[in-house]
Amino acid sequence: MLLALLPVLGIHFVLRDAQAQSVTQPDARVTVSEGASLQLRCKYSYSATPYLFWYVQYPRQGLQLLLKYYSGDPVVQGVNGFEAEFSKSNSSFHLRKASVHWSDSAVYFCAVSGFASALTFGSGTKVIVL
């Protein structure tokens, strides 16, 4: 009987874990001049140690991973000059780039997950570089 309950209990904990996590990206759209710096805000809610991610979706393409954080140095270096900083006290994982190029125009998604939970994505921030 107990063996039959284990899969059900496992599903319960995964679903409970997924319900407890959320991601907020307060800026739906950001317009920035080429060569200027960029910061995209991400706040998360998660009761345990989070895995944090930033993804980018360029026009007519799928999601691509920019960077991820689990532990260690709170400043994470990503691809193409992007970096993000983890702040446990502020529950934030803001993405930054010192100087943007027109090719950085895309939609950026922050995401959180736990050890045994699915990714929970923010609503995305559309970046337009002029």
Curated annotation (Swiss-Prot):
<keyword id="KW-0732">Signal</keyword>
<keyword id="KW-0391">Immunity</keyword>
<dbReference type="InterPro" id="IPR051287">
    <property type="entry name" value="TCR_variable_region"/>
</dbReference>
<feature type="region of interest" description="J segment">
    <location>
        <begin position="115"/>
        <end position="130"/>
    </location>
</feature>
<dbReference type="InterPro" id="IPR013106">
    <property type="entry name" value="Ig_V-set"/>
</dbReference>
<dbReference type="GO" id="GO:0002250">
    <property type="term" value="P:adaptive immune response"/>
</dbReference>
<dbReference type="InterPro" id="IPR007110">
    <property type="entry name" value="Ig-like_dom"/>
</dbReference>
<dbReference type="InterPro" id="IPR036179">
    <property type="entry name" value="Ig-like_dom_sf"/>
</dbReference>
<keyword id="KW-1064">Adaptive immunity</keyword>
<keyword id="KW-0675">Receptor</keyword>
<keyword id="KW-0393">Immunoglobulin domain</keyword>
<dbReference type="InterPro" id="IPR003599">
    <property type="entry name" value="Ig_sub"/>
</dbReference>
<keyword id="KW-0325">Glycoprotein</keyword>
<keyword id="KW-1279">T cell receptor</keyword>
<dbReference type="Pfam" id="PF07686">
    <property type="entry name" value="V-set"/>
</dbReference>
<feature type="glycosylation site" description="N-linked (GlcNAc...) asparagine">
    <location>
        <position position="90"/>
    </location>
</feature>
<feature type="signal peptide">
    <location>
        <begin position="1"/>
        <end position="20"/>
    </location>
</feature>
<dbReference type="GO" id="GO:0042101">
    <property type="term" value="C:T cell receptor complex"/>
</dbReference>
<dbReference type="InterPro" id="IPR013783">
    <property type="entry name" value="Ig-like_fold"/>
</dbReference>
<protein>
    <recommendedName>
        <fullName>T-cell receptor alpha chain V region PHDS58</fullName>
    </recommendedName>
</protein>
<feature type="region of interest" description="V segment">
    <location>
        <begin position="21"/>
        <end position="114"/>
    </location>
</feature>
